[in-house]
Amino acid sequence: MTAPQEPVDPIQDAGVEAPDLQAEIDALRAELAAAQAQAQAHQEQALRAMAEAENVRRRAQEDVSKARKFGIESFAESLVPVKDSLEAALAQPEQTAQALREGVEVTLKQLNGAFERNMLKDIAPAQGDKFDPHLHQAISSVPAPQPANTVVQLLQKGYVIADRTLRPALVVVSAGQG
């Protein structure tokens, strides 16, 4: 029978002193703890950044929603006096044609003022103006002495708001010499 062997310590067997290894293990544990703390801090920072981005996105959506909801408020406010004038005209008993016409002219001036304050402008091309597909809609083309693609007749005014066409002017254009 062989005698039981004493347990062999691999550290001592490798010729390394235990206190040196323990110091290295302690240093590595400290580095690991520092790295874990840094990773945790970075993760919390990333979560805060994601939450802030979500808050910014939500606020932007709310701003867009409010702009859509209340963007027309100024225009609507400028139309209220026009409506008041029309109602007052209808409330007047037995008006003469001349008085009615004058009232309509005043009301039209109010409406034009409201349009102007809200950057809504007429598109009313004159006869001979060059056809612009961004501002005009050709309803028909007729032989005419004017060069091709020029306005011969305005059928209905169009409108632009700021620089955007709200409704194109309806026009008849020249097909050129017939």
From Swiss-Prot:
It holds the Pfam family GrpE. Transmembrane segments: none annotated. It comes from the Bacteria. PROSITE patterns: GRPE. One of its GO terms (biological process) is protein folding. Signal peptide: none annotated. It is found in: Cytoplasm. Keywords: Chaperone, Cytoplasm, Stress response. Its main location: cytoplasm. InterPro entries: GrpE, GrpE_coiled_coil, GrpE_head. GO terms for cellular component: cytosol. Belongs to the GrpE family. HAMAP family: GrpE. Homodimer. Participates actively in the response to hyperosmotic and heat shock by preventing the aggregation of stress-denatured proteins, in association with DnaK and GrpE. It is the nucleotide exchange factor for DnaK and may function as a thermosensor. Unfolded proteins bind initially to DnaJ; upon interaction with the DnaJ-bound protein, DnaK hydrolyzes its bound ATP, resulting in the formation of a stable complex. GrpE releases ADP from DnaK; ATP binding to DnaK triggers the release of the substrate protein, thus completing the reaction cycle. This is Protein GrpE. It comes from Bordetella avium (strain 197N). The gene is grpE.
